[in-house]
Each structure stands twice: as C-alpha cells, then as structure tokens.
Amino acid sequence: MEPFSAAQNKEDKDTSVEPPRRRCHRKNKGTNVEPPSSPYHPKVLARWDPANEKRPDIGEAPVFHPTSEEFEDTLAYIEKIRPLAESFGICRIVPPSNWSPPCRLKGDSIWKNKNFPTRVQFVDLLQNRGPVKKKTPKGRKRKRGKYSRTVAPKKRNGSVSKSVSTPKATEEENFGFESGPEFTLEKFEKYAQDFKDSYFERKDNVGDPSVEEIEGEYWRIIEKETNEVKVLYGTDLENPILGSGFSKGVKIPTRRNDMDKYISSGWNLNNLARLQGSLLSFEDCEISGVQVPWLYVGMCFSTFCWHVEDNHLYSLNYHHFGEPKVWYGVPGSHATGLEKAMRKHLPDLFDEQPDLLHELVTQFSPTILKNEGVPVYRAVQNAGEYVLTFPRAYHSGFNCGFNCAEAVNVAPVDWLAHGQNAVEIYSQETRKTSLSHDKILLGAAFEAVKSLSAHGEDNTKRFSWKRFCGKDGIITKAIEARLRMEEKRIEALGNGFSLVKMDKDFDSNCERECISCFSDLHLSATGCKNCSSLEEYGCTKHDICSCEGKDRFIFLRYTIDELSSLVRALEGESDDLKAWLSKVMEGCSETQKGESSGIIVKEKQVQEECFDLNGECNKSSEICEDASIMDLAAYHVEPINLGFLVVGKLWCNKHAIFPKGFKSRVKFYNVQDPMRISYYVSEIVDAGLLGPLFKVTLEESQDESFSYASPQKCWEMVLLRVKEEIMRRSNQKQDVHMLESIDGLKMFGFRSPFIVQATEALDPNHGQVEYWNHKNEKDSLEMKDCFMSNSSQSLSKARLFGVDLN
C-alpha cells in the first residue's frame, strides 16, 4: 500500500484516467428526431455562467493504490487503510493495473434493449427552495425506497418478495425525485450528451468543460438563484432491472477461464456482503441495496444528496464507465455538526420536515459547512475506481456526465459499535432499521465461539475470529455492552413482568418491531396476554400497555445469566465455551443461515453452457443461492442437529462418532442440474439391527435421496449422479478429474473441529471404544513427535485453553 500525501494526491490527480478533453463536435445536433415536446428531448433553459462559478475551497480525500497482493483480500485492505482514511469520511481506491473487469451492461441485449426508470431532479431547488405543504409519517419511511422489513414479506428462502414493486412517485415527492421517462442505456447516453453539449455550448467551440469547471457551475446552480436546471438520474436501480455491472454466473465446474478472478473477487460487489469476516453474512434476508448492489446511471449535474448509510454501514461504490463522479465527505465524528449546520441555515425546511436528511432530496454547500467548522473533503472518482465511505460519514456528490456506478454496503467487525449507536439513534427518532443488529451481533459471537473451539484444523478461519475475542476483543465488548444495556432496561421495567423464554421462531417468518420506536425485537420483547393477541410487542424501553402486572411479560431469547456466560466464553473460559458450543450447534440452523464462508463464483464461457444470473431468477434456480459455486477444497458444513449418543460398534468408526438424529447441511452441485449449487441435508437415522443409516437428500427436491450404511458411500452416490448428469449434458466427453473423489465424512461435517468436539462431548465415558482407542493412539503419536521435536506448536493441538482434551 502506497502511503498518501498532499504530493501523492496532486500526482494522482494529474495522472488520473479522467476522460480526455475533446472538442464539442455537434455532429448529433439536428439528428435528434425527438420533437421538443418529447420527454426524450432534454429541456435546457439555463446556460453555463463561468464568471460566477462557486467551486468550494476544500481539502482532498485520501487516495490509495493497493498492490496486487493487497488487493487480494478486500476486507483486510479496508481494515488496513481505515486508520488512515476514516477521519476523512471517504476515500478513493485505485485498483492495480491488472484489474479491469468487463461490464456486462455493455452487451447489446442490455445496452440497447433493457429499459430503466429515471427520477427527475430540479438541481436549482436542491438547496434553495421554500417549504412545501406536506406531511411525512414520522419514522414510517425508509430512505432510498428500502422497504420496511414488515412490509416486504420474506420468501421461505430468505429473499425479499418480488411482489413488492418499485416505489412510485407520490404527491409527497414534489422536488428532486418525481418519476421521469424510461430509457435504454444507449438512449440515455445520447440524452445526457445532448444536455451537456447544449448547457456548456461555447461560441469558440474549444472543447468540453473540465471537472473543475463543471464543479464550479454545479455549486453556482445550487447556491445562487438561477433558471430551472432539470436533469434525470437512474438511481437506486434494483437487481431485476438491469442486473449488476459485474459478471456473475455458474458454469460446468471442469472448465476454467480468465474471468474467474473477477467473478470470485471480493471487489465484485455481488460478493462483498457475504465475504468471510463480513457481518452482513449473518443476515439471512437478501436486502436490496444493502447486501444486493444497486446501479446508478447518471448525467451531468445528477445528484446524490447528503446522507449516511442505513444503520451507519460502510459502503463501497465502483465506477463502471463514463465521466467522473465528484464526491464530498464529512467524517462520522462530525456528523452532528453537519446536521446542526443544515438546520441552522435551512430552518423552514427542517421545521416542516424534521427527518429531511433521511429523504436524500437536499443538497448543501461544502463552503457553508466549512465556515461552520465542519470539515469536508472532495474525491473525484474516475471509471475503474472505488470510493469507500465510512460509518456515519455523511456524503454527497454529483456526476460530470453520462456514467454508470454500482454500490453496496459492507460491515467489517469494527462496525459493531457504530451499528449499536445507529440502533439507539433510530430508536430516538422512531425510525425503522434495515437490519436486525442483535441477530448480526449474536451471529458474530456464535461464529467466534465455533472458531475458538476449533483446534488442529482450519487455523486461518480460527485466527481471523479469535483476534476479535478475549477480554478486550471487539465482539466480546459488543456483547458485554449489549448485555449491560439490556440488564439496566429490564431492571427499570420493575417486578411487574414475568420472564418468558422466547420461542426460537419468534421472528423467523416476520420481523418483530417495537410498536413505540420500531426497534428490532430479536433479543427481547415486552408483551401482554391481553394485548399481544394483536401481535403487538414493545422493546425493553417501552411498555405497550397499562394492564395489570400479572398479564405482562418479557420474552428473552437468552437470559442475563446466559449472556454473561457468553461473554465469559468469548473471554476464553473453557466451561462456558463448551456450554455455548453446544447451544450454537443446537440452534445453528436458526441463527446462522447467513454462513460466513467465502463466495467463489464461476463465469460462463459460452452462452449454451451457462445461465445469466444477473436478472431475475427463473423458477428452477429460485431456491439455489444464485451466482455462487463452492470451492471444492473447502466444503463448509452447517450443523442443524447434534443428535444423541448410541453406544455400539456400528455407531462409530475410528474416525468419527455417529450420533443418532445427527443432521447437517452443505452446498454441492445439484444432481438435477450441475450448473447450479443447492443445499443437501445429511442425516443419521436408526435402522434397528442394521445400526445407523446414513442419508443425503437434495433439500429442494426430497425425492432425490441417497441412503447407505456409510457416509462415504452416500456421498459417492451423489457424486456419481452429478458426473452422469454432466456427461449427459455435454456434446462431447468432458474432463471431470476435479470430481473424481469426495470425502463423505467431511461432507457430513465429521471433520469440522467444532463438530468433532461436540460429538466427543456426548461420550464423556468413552463408550465408543474403537473411536477413542484410535484417537488416544493418534494423540500419543502426536505427543511423541512433539516431544522429539520440542515443538510447542504441535503440543498445542492436544490442548484447548490449557485443558487437556484427550
């Protein structure tokens, strides 16, 4: 990573890939067949006034140039630059020269044939406008059209229902965001260029305006009274409209091509939210605009107004193609300063609409902010570059011409404190949240418990989570802070409530929110036997009624004692760690459907071999996790049920104990369609005198089931079916060497360290003699090797937190 400096910023600015200045060839002038009354004919009433430009005199945001090696791990790089960049609110990241992902939007099928909606923006009214007589229901409207989680019903597979339509213009949207006409990208490019050519037309015809000249004119329009400046913006375009600019897809796994690095990279925004280490992986619902990227198609002066990300998340924006995008950022530490300054200078607008900043319809001068003591920094983003925004960092900006960008949110572990702060602010403002912070927090804690319990294998994953544990670990401190907060609130409610264990499915099918402040109720909820028949609940800060105490109750997912034990487990207390490992194993399917494994996806090479997964899923692929394919070397098993011990020769072998009723879940190639990845459920049932029967079932098609007396044979049968289907679909014989073998024990989960430890805990008396004899023999050999080599590292494999596990 090259350190940045003032000189670095200047050098970068001088050598940026800003589109070259060209002469304003008006060859298209007069060829536009659209009549002046057509919505596809830009109305240009104002003209460039360079003599009165208002370019703000502010500092530049830092620019980073990762090496190819640094660029390999997206979240690690963000963590690396955070101490240098967070105090600016935003930063620019210029990828290595070998990063040049093709943009799928440029194919004729999309560029010329797919329409997208636009929104009208009156740029001259984004700051200077009078109040509009309207009322907005307080706290009932989420920014950027992200629907309330109670309004958008979840499908059984966790995605947001497609029945919810794109928000339409209403009478409330009187400035900045009324609906505009639909365009193809090809037509919008011409519309945008016609507008820019007309607006900046010069008598001398010397060339296009520079970024600096456009910026000066933009702020003249914002700050000074001027003629109407009306532009269009294709903003917040959800995935089904145009899809992603990044390629994603699956292909026959035996083929390889040069696209793999772009499809599997964490810098592909389709993968970012689900990367190992991203806390958003613990939110099983696919939230559009948060985990699923949105596209933005801009033209000159089209604007994104001052805002912070939902739940104070990070955001990462990639500029696919076109003219530059100018950003402004305010560090999160000065967020309240920006809010105070805007309220001071725009009192009428805030009096009428206190939540004005949530609506993204108000721009505000960086010059005024600077004069009010609020630091503002600029970043000019060119095609092929990223802009990263930090938690609670207000940001805004505009486009210099026709371009296309894509953005998504991300939550590294350090976001936890910011997310909790956002929850408290949203509660005070009675504003709905996009995420269940408690669900994410518990998901991270459970992942940490599993990683702390692992030993001897999977070191990379274990160490990546272990560093967030311990007494001063980020996850430990976040759980402890949440525990103390909940403890005080329950005490404040008094003794008039009975404590009731929350059903594990309390919020599985619908999101529960406090009727008073809209806080998420995943961890706890207050209710009343008389009133809760209406499915109304409150948080531990609010009573929902004034009924008698005997009728009121508090649902607790975990008691205060259990949460205290979780804190101790994260600090490394072995007894608490074992207890929580058991809880995590039992409840894993409910709390960790958003598995934090890395996503590795494959690109199509020829059309007939692969589906395009950027648009809406068709029926056959709706159940699978589209655009993802596993790494054959790194199966990730999700335990569902641990089962119970049956002592007997057939219920173990020298490698594993086989609990009756054990059940797990893993992704593998679909036997019906190997170009898709689907979930399989592996389970162990009691076959009477025959002992355990191992069974593997395709989750989406229960008829596809494979049973045998060994886990190895079960999964070999699955593999054989996959290979047969691949051969059947191929016009010629395929090379299937990648699928020649499979490890049945690993696919069941019996090589996962935390599953091994949990099954061993079922047999404290070592009744499964064959398994324990082999384990003791193996451990003795390891200890002998350890003694001979004097290697403390090898010795540690037989111990966990100083406790002998033999």
From Swiss-Prot:
Write out the catalysed reaction. N(6),N(6),N(6)-trimethyl-L-lysyl(4)-[histone H3] + 2-oxoglutarate + O2 = N(6),N(6)-dimethyl-L-lysyl(4)-[histone H3] + formaldehyde + succinate + CO2
Enumerate the residues binding Zn(2+) 2: 528, 531, 545, 547
EC number(s) given by UniProt: 1.14.11.-
Residues in FYR C-terminal domain copies: 689-775
Any one GO biological process: negative regulation of gene expression, epigenetic
Q: Where does Fe cation bind?
A: 307, 309, 395
Disordered: region residues:
1-43, 128-176
Described function: Histone demethylase that demethylates 'Lys-4' (H3K4me) of histone H3 with a specific activity for H3K4me3. No activity on H3K4me2, H3K4me1, H3K9me3/2, H3K27me3/2 and H3K36me3/2. Involved in the control of flowering time by demethylating H3K4me3 at the FLC locus and repressing its expression. The repression of FLC level and reduction in H3K4me3 at the FLC locus results in induction of the flowering activator FT, which is a downstream target of FLC.
Q: What is this protein called?
A: Lysine-specific demethylase JMJ15
List the source organism. Answer: Arabidopsis thaliana
Source organism lineage?
A: Eukaryota, Viridiplantae, Streptophyta, Embryophyta, Tracheophyta
- Gene symbol? JMJ15
